[in-house]
Amino acid sequence: MPATTSRLRAAIPARLLLPLFVLLAVLSLAVSACGSGSDKAGDQPHRLSVFAASSLTDAFTQLGADFTAAHPGVKVVFDFAGSNDLVTQLQQGAPADVLATADTASMDDAGSLVGTPQAFAGNKLIIAVEPGNPHHITSLADLSRKGLKVVLAAPEVPAGKYAQEALGKAGVSVTPVSLEVSVKGVVTKISLGEADAGIVYVTDVDAAKGKIDGVAIPGAQNVVASYPIATVKDGTYPDDASAFLDYVLSDEGQKVLADNGFLPAP
């Protein structure tokens, strides 16, 4: 037995030795637990923040799940909203790693906050109506019918801007009962019976089957929406952001978008 230990025991009364050793054992376990907790926390995936237009909700949710499955250290989290709202959030300092908008104008507004945008998908407009089309709407001209409750996205929102462009091509003037902050708001109002019709993306009708029906808009009156995506320059995880962007543009990512009704990038 080392002399130091012998001297220690001689200096400490026997009645105190057992409590002392118990205390040392408890402290040792506590330190080990703290170390184990730190390692566990370090193994948790970090959150890749993606700001995406509301019309991308279903497709990007699937893309995010697939990307997370292929990259266990990353968990993709989304903020879905109107494109202009997302850009405003970025301009006000909200943290994000990727931005995907429903039009090039909104992406342009992001300016130097983002890297070089790349178009990754397209979309077209459709008239959304209640299931069974009880008001027998067949064209954009019918939306000007007296007494018909029409809801549109606000003009500063891409879907609202595109809707006004389509109505202009058709020579139709509509006074909506409501202007929504995103295209999803239009879908919700119609599906709840609070409006009779509206103009949304084809993908919105596909995603809400059973809740709303769609009436096609002729090509000459329709508008093709272009969706750009870019990494955010001050994002926390630039490498993962680039990898997610590459996945969206990949054949696999494009198939997910096509399965959700999106067109190839125009």
Predicted regions, residues:
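Sec-dependent bacterial lipoprotein signal peptides
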Residues: M1-S32
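Short, structured active-site "lid" loops
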Residues: G93-A102
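Short, high-confidence coil segments that cap the C-terminus of an alpha-helix
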Residues: G73, P95-A96, A195
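Acidic/His-rich segments in extracytoplasmic proteins that coordinate ligands and/or metal ions
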Residues: V87-Q92, D108-G115
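Exported/periplasmic ABC-transporter solute-binding proteins
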Residues: A3-T4, A30-A69, N84, T88, ...
